[in-house]
Amino acid sequence: EKIISVNAGSSSLKFQLFEMDDESVITSGVIERIGLEDSIFTIKYQGEKSVTTQNIKDHKVAVQLLLDTLVEKGIVKDLNEIKGVGHRVVQGGAYFDSSVVIDEDVVNKIDELKSLAPLHNPAHLTGYYAFKEAIPNAGAVAVFDTAFHQTLEPRCYIYPIPYKYYTDYKVRKYGAHGTSHFYVSQRAIDLLG
């Protein structure tokens, strides 16, 4: 089985395709400058790196180009080999303290939180919909940057400003780069015992 991990940014799509039997990276790369005439598609596979420049008008086109390339290069024989898509999501607010399978409720909450990450959450949803359309049988999971920080005590995440800003407008510290913090903390445990 293969899983693809993606990070759909406002004008980019980063990806890694994993073979889950041994958790090895099969291919990785990035599509940059999406929406511009000189978009750049970089893919690394079997020790080689390919870089092409072309017009990639939106994330839907970027996702289709990526998936077509995976088949054309023989990286996958068929898109049905991809059993799941992991989507990095910047802002999960206080809703999510772990990764979740994406359903309609999750999509609605990611959309609701777009004001907290206006350059990121809308792009994540665009990427989600593009993959869902292209490989509808693959499961989809959202991995939230903010999830790692949800164990903070209220005294740590509430700003020293009038409390009504927290209750009325949800102004608080949500944390950032939690997936990296989680990895580093787990790695430290592994190394330090």
Model-found features: residue ranges?
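Residue-level signal for inorganic ion chemistry
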Residues: 7, 31, 85, 145
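ATP-dependent carbohydrate kinase catalytic cores
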Residues: 125-129, 133-193
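Short glycine-aspartate micro-motif
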Residues: 3-5, 84-86, 141
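Phosphate/pyrophosphate-binding loops at sites that engage ATP/ADP/AMP, CoA/4′-phosphopantetheine
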Residues: 69-83, 188-193
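Short beta-strand-loop/turn "lid" adjacent to the catalytic site in phosphate-handling enzymes
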Residues: 75-120, 148-156
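A glycine- and small-aliphatic-rich helix-loop capping segment at beta-alpha/alpha-beta transitions
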Residues: 18-23, 98-108, 155-165, 191
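Short glycine-rich, Thr/Ser-proximal phosphate-binding strand/loop in the N-terminal lobe
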Residues: 3, 12-56
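A structured beta-alpha segment of the ubiquitous adenosine-cofactor-binding alpha/beta core
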Residues: 51-78
